């Protein structure tokens, strides 16, 4: 068979705002990874050993190029994707490509969680310092390149993390009367939030507190959900509650950050939070140009 070799850039970044007037970079992880078919390990060596030694060989060759050596560009990791045992992989024309891409995406979500762990280990998150994570906090344990034990331990780092999603399914939850929540969300007044709802992860491994906030007054919004964000926090144990005052403080701070400075630059501007927009911009500025990446191979 013909198997694709895939390369991906992974950038995970975090910025901090020590005061209203100061916004600065905090952490950045940048990796270039290769996703290769598992049968590329032709000697059936232990996967980790094979990937490490082959990665070293590639970097040895790359360093012969003066520009690459000077810029410190290197392949950080080799991932091996599945090539059999699954009809979706073997029968779909793009099956191998999808399998390889999934490996790279899993590496990215792993790095997101490892960055949260690093913030916790540096005592940067507490009752006075919360992390706003762009997107959902729901991670699927089936899509990880970490061991199950290591992945499970990462979930304990999310006490002071709030996931904020610009795009969401308004019909994900039902209200306390069993009706779809989409109508309640659509009818939110400016700066109003919904009640907080308990949501169990699809894989049943964790529970979340979820609520929705309308960020601004907008007479010309495209849809009823254009300036609404979905907020979520991990519940530390089944049945746990989060104090209403804390939810209100978090919601108020999120509303304060909703400056539409990226209007016209991003179709999601109505749902944007300014610090997230700046952090996204910071991360994008650290990507290698496509020409440089392609010329590595």
Language-model segment annotations:
Residues 1-3, 15:
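Two-metal-ion RNase H-like nuclease active-site motif
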Residues 6-7:
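Short coil-to-beta strand junction motifs in C2/discoidin
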Residues 20-297:
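Long, contiguous domain-sized segments
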């Amino acid at each position: 068979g013909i198997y694709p070799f895939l390369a991906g850039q992974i950038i995970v970044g975090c910025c901090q705002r020590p005061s209203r007037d100061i916004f600065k970079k905090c952490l950045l992880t940048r990796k270039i990874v290769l996703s290769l078919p598992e049968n590329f390990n032709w000697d059936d060596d232990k996967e980790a050993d094979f990937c490490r030694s082959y990665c070293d060989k590639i970097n040895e060759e790359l360093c012969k190029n003066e520009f690459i050596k000077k810029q410190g560009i290197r392949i950080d990791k080799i991932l091996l994707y599945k090539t059999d045992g699954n009809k979706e992989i073997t029968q779909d024309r793009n099956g191998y490509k999808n399998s390889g891409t999934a490996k790279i995406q899993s590496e990215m979500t792993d790095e997101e969680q490892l960055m949260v762990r690093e913030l916790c280990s540096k005592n940067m998150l507490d009752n006075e310092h919360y992390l706003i994570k762009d997107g959902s906090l729901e991670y699927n344990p089936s899509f990880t390149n970490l061991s199950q034990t290591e992945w499970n331990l990462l979930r304990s780092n999310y006490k002071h993390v709030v996931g904020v999603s610009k795009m969401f399914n308004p019909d994900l939850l039902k209200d306390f009367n069993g009706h779809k929540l989409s109508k309640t969300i659509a009818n939110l007044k400016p700066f109003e939030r919904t009640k907080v709802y308990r949501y169990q992860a699809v894989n049943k491994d964790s529970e979340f507190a979820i609520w929705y906030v309308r960020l601004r007054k907008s007479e010309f919004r495209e849809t009823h959900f254009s300036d609404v964000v979905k907020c979520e926090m991990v519940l530390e144990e089944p049945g746990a509650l989060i104090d209403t005052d804390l939810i209100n403080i978090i919601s108020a701070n999120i509303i304060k950050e909703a400056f539409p400075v990226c209007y016209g630059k991003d179709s999601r501007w109505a749902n944007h939070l300014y610090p997230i927009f700046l952090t996204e911009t910071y991360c994008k500025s650290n990507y290698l140009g496509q020409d440089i990446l392609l010329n590595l191979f």
